[in-house]
Amino acid sequence: MANVTLSSVYKAFGEAVISRDINLEIDDGEFVVFVGPSGCGKSTLLRMIAGLEDITSGELLIGGKRMNEVPPSERGIGMVFQSYALYPHLSVAENMSFGLKLAGVKKAEIYQRVNQVAEVLQLAHLLDRRPKALSGGQRQRVAIGRTLVSEPDVFLLDEPLSNLDAALRVQMRIEISRLHKRLERTMIYVTHDQVEAMTLADKIVVLDAGNIAQVGKPLELYHYPANRFVAGFIGSPKMNFLPVKVTAAEPRQVQIELPNHQRVWLPVEGDQVQVGANMSLGIRPEHLLPSSASEVTLEGEIQVVEQLGNETQIHIQIPAIRQNLVYRQNDVVLVEEGATFSIGLPPHRCHLFREDGTACKRLYQELGV
C-alpha cells in the first residue's frame, strides 16, 4: 500500500493546457474519486499517475518516491480501463494470469494468486470459461481480478462501469466498495457519474477545466460547496440558482432581496460581503418546501411535471427570472402543468455565491458533516 502526492502538476499538449497546478494528497488506503464533466482532465490526471502520460512540470510521489521518470511497470500500480481488454481466446484463469506469466512468476504462486482472487470476486466457478460466455458484470470482475493478482500498491480505475447497464452498475458499485474495504488498498477512481462518486469515495476531487474545484468528503461537497460550479455539479437534479441583491451584511448573517422583492436573512458569513452587491442564491430541489411550511415563498407557473413513482419533480417558471426552478418532493404530487404553484425557501438551507462564483461560508451545521 502507498500514499500518492501530486505537487504543482501541470500538463499541456502544445498550447492546450489539460491540468493546471494540481496539488493533491491521497492517503494510504484511501478511496479517492476524480469526478467532473467531459474534458475536465480527470482521465489525463489518472494516466499521469499511471505513467501513460508524461508530466509537463511538477512532481508525482508514490510511497514517498518520485515517479516522474519511472516506467509504468515499476510504479506499483494496477489499472482497470473502461474497456475490459480481455483476450477472447483465453479462459478467465488464463486472462487473469497472463501478466504474471510474462513477469516470470512461478506456476505454483500464479495458481495460488488466481484462485485466491477468484474467490474474492466470486469467479471461482468461471475460471475455465472464455469471455464470450460471461455477462458484462462478470467480464468487468475478470478485468479487476487481472489487476488484483499483480498485487499493486495503488489501484487506478478509469470509468470501469460506464459500459454496464443501470442494474449492473449498482451491483458493481457495491462489489467495488466491498473489495476496497477488504483489501484496504489505495484506490483512485475516475468517473463522470456523481452517483458513483458519492457512494464510493472517502474523498472526492471535483475537476473543472483542468483545475481542482474542490476536494472533500461526499457530504461536505453536497452541503458546503466551495463555489457555484461544485454546487451545480454535485446533486441531481442540480441546484437551483436565483439572482439576488445584498441589502444588509453582518458577520454571521446576510440579508438579500429575492426577485419578488421579499427580503430574508441567510445564516452565512458576511464579513467580505458588500451591501448592494449582486449575488446568486442557491437551493437544492429537495430542500424546497411547500409554501405553507415557510415564511419565505416564491410563486410561479408549473411548466413540467415529472412523476418518478418514488418522487415528483416539478419545474416552475418564476416571473422576473428566465430559468425554471425545480422542486422535488418524495412521493406522488398531483398537480397540472400550467397551474400556479407556490414553494417555500428555508433560509438555513440556502447557499450564497459571489459574482466570481465563490461561496459565502454557510454557518448552519448539517447532519453527518
Swiss-Prot record:
* Record keywords: ATP-binding, Cell inner membrane, Cell membrane, Membrane, Nucleotide-binding, Sugar transport, Translocase, Transport
- Could you list the residue ranges that cross the membrane? none
SMART domains attached to this UniProt entry = AAA
Q: Does the keyword Membrane apply?
A: yes
Sequence positions that bind ATP? 36-43
What is catalyzed by this enzyme? D-maltose(out) + ATP + H2O = D-maltose(in) + ADP + phosphate + H(+)
Query: Does Endoplasmic reticulum count among this protein's keywords?
Result: no
Listed GO molecular functions? ABC-type maltose transporter activity; ATP binding; ATP hydrolysis activity
Q: How does it sit in the membrane?
A: Peripheral membrane protein
Residue ranges constituting the ABC transporter domain according to the UniProt record? 4-234
Q: List the Pfam families.
A: ABC_tran, OB_MalK
Q: Which domain of life is it from?
A: Bacteria
Report the locations given in the UniProt record. Answer: Cell inner membrane
Tell me its EC number(s), please: 7.5.2.1
What's a GO cellular component annotated to this UniProt protein?
ATP-binding cassette (ABC) transporter complex, substrate-binding subunit-containing
State what this protein does: Part of the ABC transporter complex MalEFGK involved in maltose/maltodextrin import. Responsible for energy coupling to the transport system.
Similarity comment: Belongs to the ABC transporter superfamily. Maltooligosaccharide importer (TC 3.A.1.1.1) family.
Q: Give the multimer and partner information.
A: The complex is composed of two ATP-binding proteins (MalK), two transmembrane proteins (MalG and MalK) and a solute-binding protein (MalE).
The protein in question is named Maltose/maltodextrin import ATP-binding protein MalK
Identify the species of origin: Yersinia pestis
Q: Quick one: which gene encodes this?
A: malK
